[in-house]
Amino acid sequence: SIGYYEVKKKPMCYAGGDINAPCWYHQYSFARDVFANYIITALWLKDELSEQELKIVDKYINKMYKKFLEPTELHKEEQGFYQFANGGLAILVYASWTNNKKLAAEEINHRFKEMDRLFYEDGYINNNSFRGVKAQWYHSMGLDIALGYVYIADLWGAETPKKLHNKLVRASEVVNLAIADWDKFTSRKYSGTQHNKISSKDSARMHTSHMAFALDTLMKIVTGVELEHDAVYLQKRTYHMKDGIDESIGFNPNCID
């Protein structure tokens, strides 16, 4: 699979709004996220591994970390909030595997600042909320990932800044706005460059992201906001519930005790 340094040399996804354009970044991010889930599995099995097995797994994890994640440590993402918190959750998983509290602290501080920059005061998300006919889907996905990150950061002992928390509350309210009034939701204009905005109605996803199958749970836990009734979302999310975990954050929020 393509590594981080190689993917930076490739064209952006949906170049020129072409939905058929090759998306090299997806190949990289999917491989990165599979690797993150590999570490999560290794963490669960760590106490069951023999000394030789642990040595092999640890060597592989360190090798893959250098390829997919080490180059992104403290990297400033200019647009959007996507899978595994732009890789931040994967870095926290690695920090857990290596028991590197310093790395975890640096990552959380960096990611909170990034989230504060990418989440606007009114709750809209840079890039995510302005994806044309997929805006609702990507906004709710971005919020799901942000809430998942905040929940995990809390387990590390981090306190979410009040300003960021307020933005997440508003972002939750924007999820509900998109459900209740699509036109009002999309009336918010975006002043930046949007290379991945999709206008084709054939590609429309005018519903809450069904991949975020426990968004209602995370919203209630982290922000206290109740998710509005979205019939399409409730029907479609059943497919991803069978996956067992939310693949964008690496765990199942419905299993939170």
Regions found by a protein language model. Name each.
Residues 152, 156, 170-174, 181, ...:
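Terminal, non-catalytic domain-edge segments
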